[in-house]
Structure formats: structure tokens, C-alpha cells
Amino acid sequence: MIDETAKKDLVKALGERVQFDAPMSRHTSLRIGGPADALATPADRQELAALLEICRQRRLRRTIIGAGFNCLVADRGIEGVVITLRKFRGLEERPGPTVYAEAGVSHSAVTRFCTERGLSGMEFAAGIPGTVGGWIMMNAGIGVREQKDVALELGFVTSENTEEEIRKTSTLDFGYRELRGLPEDAVIVSALFALKVSSREEVKAEVDRLLSHRSATQPLDVPSCGSVFRNPQGDFAGRLIEAAGLCGERVGGAEISAVHANFIANLGGARAADVLALIERARTRVLDACGVELQTEVHLVGRSE
């Protein structure tokens, strides 16, 4: 819990942009999650710096979320301060050609921006949900193409240094759905992407193709968190889950999708406990049936049950 003194500090710094006991089900793509002690939405870098300083001084646990994809928030909620950078929406074309985007810009906005200008390189990201900050931290991608292939540099701040530091991505260690090499408490605030000059028609054609494919192969009409498990080397988590006979498996309001078995959908009223039960069931059944131990891609956030 956050004491009254810390609450006053947060309100003084952010005003109405901090909410207490904020239900996280309203801020995650799965529409699941108990309350955060505080949900803070800084308007700019100055407010973010003030917020990080308060968290440091008051020893408040902090959690960064983007658009709420790729995370499962516990039914008991999240301790401390949840920070969302959705007001960090700067987006502009720069020489190179490159595109500068702040952490709160949505993936779809960047894709549209590049398409309109005939800039090629980000087509693979079409339809991948989330925000720039989240993509970079997750090294989001599809097939052999990931964020590390287009991100030239990124900007971040820390609790100890609230002045933005720029780091070349070539100096960082990108892995499968992860980024290593930044300070543990780093908050990504921007990224610069290296692109190529193409034509609007060519870029749009590829974007449309990928969007059509995703629409046909993913359950986009129900709340989900995206891929639940990482793909094992040389195989696909969805194929293994389907082979284990788990398509359509339900616990409470949660279901392993029959459209794409690596998605768990909230059909209405699902709890985090329901999703966790399906995750454990899938891991057990796939291990028994296929001899493969699945690793989660979705991040489990909040108070343990």
C-alpha cells in the first residue's frame, strides 16, 4: 500500500494524472487484473522525472506498462506505482531516412506513418499490438524479423539519471522476445528506426497482406494478450498445444483459442487464476504429449496469489 504522504507527493507532481486503486482490467488487453495501488500517466519527461524521483525517495515499487498487451495482471492487483507512457506520442520522420517515435506511440500508428510516406522496413510489424516502448523491450517481431533489425538507437531514463540517455542498439544484447544490456530500472522513452525509401503502394500492399493473414489466423474479436508462449526452436507453440488436444479448453471465462492455440481468450468474466490454470495445463499436456517444455512469453505482473 502507498501511505498518505507518498500519495500527496504523487498528486502534487501529477494532479489528476494519478489514480489510486485503479482497476487494471481497464488497462490491459485481456481485460483482467486487480487494482494497482496507483496508476500514473506522466504528460512529459519532466513529470516522468519527478515521478521516478518520488518512487526512489519513497521506496515505491514501480511497474511500466505500455498498451497492456503481453501481460497478465494478478487478481490481487499490483503493488506500488504502475506507470504508463501513453502520453509520450512524438512521431516524426528524420533524415536517413529514419523515424523517431516516443514510447507511447502505438504500433499501428507507426505502421500507418511509414506507409503514408512510402518508408519500408516496418511492414513486418503490421497488426502486432502494443507501443514502441513495449516492442523494444520485448524485441517484438515475426519470423526472422524483429525490432533489433530496424531499431537504430533508443532513449531511456533511470531512477538515478532522469536525463534521457541515447544508446545505439548495436551495443545492446537482443534475444528472443527480450532485451538485455540496459540498467535494470531503465525506462525506454523513445526509439529511432532505420528505414528504406520505397513507394506508398508497395508498402501498403505488404501491410495489407500481413493484416489479412493475421485477421484470418488470430482471434482478434475477443480480448487476449497475444502469444502466451514462446515458440520453441524449430517449432511453434500453437502447433504443439493443438497437437496436445487443447484447442477450446476452458477454465472459468478463459479459453485456449480454437483459431490460434497460442492465444488464450477472455470470453467474459475471466480471472487471472483461470488463465494461469490454462497456462499450467498447456505446459503439462504439451510436455507429456510432445516432450517439449513451453516457456511463457506473456509477463505475469502483480501480487502473487
What residues fall within each predicted segment?
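Conserved active-site and cofactor/substrate-binding residues in soluble primary-metabolism enzymes
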Residues: 5, 25, 43-46, 105, ...
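Short clusters of hydrophobic/aromatic residues that line enzyme substrate/ligand-binding pockets
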Residues: 18, 24, 30, 91, ...
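Phosphate/pyrophosphate- and phosphate-bearing ligand-binding catalytic cores of soluble enzymes
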Residues: 19-20, 71, 157-277, 281-305
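Short, flexible micro-motifs
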Residues: 36, 69-73, 107, 133-137, ...
